[in-house]
Amino acid sequence: LPATIALVEVGPRDGLQNEREIVPVGAKIAFVDALAEAGLREIEVSSFVSPKWVPQLADASDVFAKLKHRENVVYSALVPNMKGMERALACGVRKIAVFTAATETFCKKNINMTFAESLQAFLPVVAEAKRNGVAVRGYLSTAFGCPYEGNVPPTQAAIAARRLADLGCDELSIGDTIGIAAPPGVEALLGLLKFPRDRT
């Protein structure tokens, strides 16, 4: 295990995206600023997703434009497709995240694609990020358990993680989406994952 860990705060994106009452831009910026002031060095600010799907994050461009960027803080964003990537680049975002899941049912219900289709959708996004010197995090949800399919075998999650990493992600986020992971399962999955030392 590494001697240190890096915390990535996703509250401004993941925490707010399902709120029914629209949070004003100023309040979102104040939230991000408070997190940075607390010492967090990477904050996922928003998502460049279709406003039709996530109205709460329709103001992503506005939030990034008005945010006071601190030199020692990475401000990242979730980017689901090329349209979102173009918006992120226009805002000067220097790190993005793409999102899929280890189970087919969760993929279909959450992003309306199969796992394979999600990887195909991310290929041009990651390539464009690399062309522009933008770092990429790959999210893998339901790595331990799925609300629809139950327990996920470590081998299944490891194969999905490998395919996500092979897109060119600089780091992987392995998600315990429904909160059922236990030390033996975590150890089993991490033991199957191989990731270059220059990536995390």
Predicted regions and their residues:
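Active-site mouth loops of central-metabolism enzymes
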Residues: 7-28, 72-82, 108-115, 142-156
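Alpha-helix-loop-beta-strand connector modules within alpha/beta enzyme cores
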Residues: 53-77, 116-138, 161-162, 185-200
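Distinct, well-ordered alpha-helical segments
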Residues: 56-57, 87-92, 148-157, 182-193
